[in-house]
Amino acid sequence: MKTYKIALIKGDGIGPEIIDEAVKVLDAVASCCDLEFSYEEALMGGCAYDITGDPLPQETINISLNSDAVLFGAIGGAKWDNLPREKRPESGLLRFRKELGVYANLRPANVFDELINASSLKAEVIKGVDLMVVRELIGGIYFGEPKGRDENRGWNTMVYTREEIVRIAHQAFKIAMSRSKRVCSIDKANVLDVSQLWREVVIEVAKEYPEVELTHMYVDNAAMQLIRDPRQFDVMLTGNIFGDILSDEASMLSGSIGLLPSASVGAKIGVYEPIHGSAPDIAGQGIANPIATILSASMMLRYALGEHGAADKIDAAVKRALKEGYRTKDLAQYDAKEVCSTSEMGSIIANYAAK
C-alpha cells in the first residue's frame, strides 16, 4: 500500500466545505486503489491573519514543504479588504507560491456533454472542448523590476529570462505528450522584445519533443480564437499576464467556474485548487459546488503522485454524477433531476469513485 502525506489548506469562505468533500472522495478512491492518505491541516488567508496576524504563517510553509502535495480551498473576503496590502489574504497566497517555488499554473478547460447548455457559446462550438492552459506563474510583468508610481505616472517591467522560459516550455511539452501532442505558444512577438525571446526559446525546446506539433499565436488573436473555435487548442503555453487573462476566458467555456480545477507546480511541490474564489456570501449554507475541488484532487493524484488510475476513477465518478442529473444549486437550471447540497454531491461522487 502506498501512503501519501497531503497538506490541507482549507482557507476562507466556502474553502472548508469544499475541501471536506474532496477528502471524502480521496478516501473513497483510496479504499479501492490500495492507497492511504494522511492529512495535516494548515492555515492561510484571512483565517490565518485572524489567528496569527499573518496571512501566511511559517508553520504553513513548513507543513507544505514536508508533504507530497497541497490541496487548497480558497481565501479572501470583504472582511479583510481594508487591511494593509501585505496583510491581506491574497498577499499570503503570492508569498506561498514563491516559498514553494511553483512556477507553472495548469488550467484545464473542458466541457461536459451533460452541461453543454450552461455555456454562453453555441453547443456546436464547444462540444468536445478539452484544452489546458499552461501559464508561467512567477515571472513577467507582475514581478519585474523596476515598478512603481508617482502622482502622474505608473510603471511596470515585463522581464523573462531564458531559464524561466525553458522550464515552463518543458512543462507544457511534457503535458502535451500525455494529451493530443499539440502546443500553441501564445506571445506578442510582433511588438514585444520579451516575447521575441520567448518565441525563440520555445522553438529551441520544441526540438526535444519531435512528436509534438508546435504553433505560435499572438495573444490578441488567441483571445478571439478561444471564442471562435476553442477545439483547435490542446495545450496553450503562455506567460504570466497573458495566461492570467486567457485562462479566465477559457474557464467560461464550460459555463461554470464551479467545475474547473487548477494546479500550480514547480520544482518542490504542487498546489491543487479550484479556480473559483471563497464565495463568503454562500459560506456555511451547504450549497457550494465541490466539483472543482474534487477535480483538483484528481489533478493532484495525476500530476503530483502519478496515481493515474485513481485520478481516472474520480474523473469518471464526476462525469457519472452529472450524467445522472445530480446538480448543486448553481447548476440546478441545467437538466437537474436532483438538486444536491455540497455534502450530498461529495457523497454521490465518493460512492461512484469507490466502485
Curated annotation (Swiss-Prot):
Pathway: Amino-acid biosynthesis; L-leucine biosynthesis; L-leucine from 3-methyl-2-oxobutanoate: step 3/4. InterPro entries: IsoCit/isopropylmalate_DH_CS, IsoPropMal-DH-like_dom, Isopropylmalate_DH. Its cofactor is Mg(2+); Mn(2+). Substrate binds at R97, R107, R135, D220. Mg(2+) binds at D220, D244, D248. Homodimer. One of its GO terms (cellular component) is cytosol. Catalyzes the oxidation of 3-carboxy-2-hydroxy-4-methylpentanoate (3-isopropylmalate) to 3-carboxy-4-methyl-2-oxopentanoate. The product decarboxylates to 4-methyl-2 oxopentanoate. Belongs to the isocitrate and isopropylmalate dehydrogenases family. LeuB type 1 subfamily. SUPFAM superfamilies: Isocitrate/Isopropylmalate dehydrogenase-like (SSF53659). Binds 1 Mg(2+) or Mn(2+) ion per subunit. Gene3D superfamilies: Isopropylmalate Dehydrogenase (3.40.718.10). It catalyses: (2R,3S)-3-isopropylmalate + NAD(+) = 4-methyl-2-oxopentanoate + CO2 + NADH. NAD(+) binds at residues 77-90, 277-289. Keywords: Amino-acid biosynthesis, Branched-chain amino acid biosynthesis, Cytoplasm, Leucine biosynthesis, Magnesium, Manganese, Metal-binding, NAD, Oxidoreductase. GO terms for biological process: L-leucine biosynthetic process. The keyword Transit peptide does not apply. HAMAP family: LeuB_type1. Its EC number is 1.1.1.85. Its main location: cytoplasm. It is found in: Cytoplasm. GO terms for molecular function: 3-isopropylmalate dehydrogenase activity; magnesium ion binding; NAD binding. The record marks Y142, K188 as: Important for catalysis. This is 3-isopropylmalate dehydrogenase. It comes from Sulfurimonas denitrificans (strain ATCC 33889 / DSM 1251) (Thiomicrospira denitrificans (strain ATCC 33889 / DSM 1251)).
